[in-house]
């Protein structure tokens, strides 16, 4: 029982670490991409936005089967880094759409005003734009975390069962006839997710109080 508990706690830690890394990477990449797209040509902007929908069109099983061979060639199969990479493919579009729309609403006009007042570009971005985008950034962070945390097939296919996450642990019980145990693990999954989202929301609240962010929505 102790060994099983240790494996469970290890799978929880792996899931949370993996999902947090994916969420942070997705949000950062989406933020930088959104800034570039706001300043880009309208045709290029529409083309990139349309291409972001590809992960929603291609079924997960087809994508996982196709990318698995490449992961073996690249030496990323059965490794956490390979799972992070494929999770990014499915979490990044959510972040990109959310942050891009928010960045379009905010624009760079506030940064330009800060430049005129003597602020350096990086100072204007950190102290002006980021506080304005913080609600959407934490929404995107939460969405990416949920997408990664709930992935089963991609994790199983690319991880080869070597990387144990909470979903890999739970799924066999969901398929079994032991509904009581399956329900307990499902509640554990839900509880962990809610706690993490509450932490994200708390950090966002503290930042809003600090920067007195303006709500454009």
Which residues does each predicted region cover?
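Amphipathic cytosolic juxtamembrane alpha-helices at the membrane-cytosol interface
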Residues: 13, 17, 43-46, 106-139
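Membrane-interfacial helix termini and adjacent extracytoplasmic/periplasmic loops
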Residues: 44-46, 61-92, 122, 158-161
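Cytoplasmic-entry segments and transmembrane alpha-helices of multi-pass inner-membrane transporters
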Residues: 29-69, 111, 217
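Transmembrane alpha-helix signature in integral membrane proteins
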Residues: 4-39
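Amphipathic alpha-helical segments that mediate coupling or scaffolding at interfaces
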Residues: 1-2, 15, 36, 40, ...
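Interhelical loop and adjacent transmembrane-helix boundary motif
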Residues: 1-7, 148-205, 217
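C-terminal transmembrane helix and the adjacent membrane-cytosol boundary/short C-terminal tail
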Residues: 100-109, 115, 121-128, 183-217
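Faces of alpha-helical transmembrane segments in polytopic inner-membrane proteins
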Residues: 22, 29, 51-62, 82-100, ...
């Amino acid at each position: 029982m102790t060994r099983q508990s240790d494996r469970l706690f290890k799978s929880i830690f792996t899931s949370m670490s993996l999902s947090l890394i994916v969420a942070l990477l997705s949000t950062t990449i989406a933020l930088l991409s959104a800034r570039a797209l706001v300043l880009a040509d309208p045709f290029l902007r529409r083309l990139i936005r349309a291409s972001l929908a590809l992960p929603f069109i291609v079924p997960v099983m087809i994508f996982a089967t196709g990318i698995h061979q490449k992961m073996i060639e690249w030496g990323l199969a059965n490794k956490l880094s390979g799972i992070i990479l494929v999770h990014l493919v499915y979490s990044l579009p959510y972040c990109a759409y959310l942050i891009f729309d928010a960045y379009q609403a905010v624009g760079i006009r506030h940064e330009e005003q800060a430049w005129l007042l003597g602020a350096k570009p990086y100072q204007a971005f950190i102290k002006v734009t980021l506080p304005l985008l913080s609600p959407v950034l934490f929404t995107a962070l939460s969405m990416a975390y949920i997408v990664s945390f709930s992935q089963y097939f991609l994790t199983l296919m690319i991880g080869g069962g070597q990387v144990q996450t909470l979903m890999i642990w739970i799924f066999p019980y969901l398929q079994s006839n032991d509904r009581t145990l399956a329900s307990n693990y499902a509640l554990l999954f839900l509880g962990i997710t809610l706690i993490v989202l509450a932490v994200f929301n708390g950090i966002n609240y503290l930042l809003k109080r600090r920067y007195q962010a303006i709500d454009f929505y």
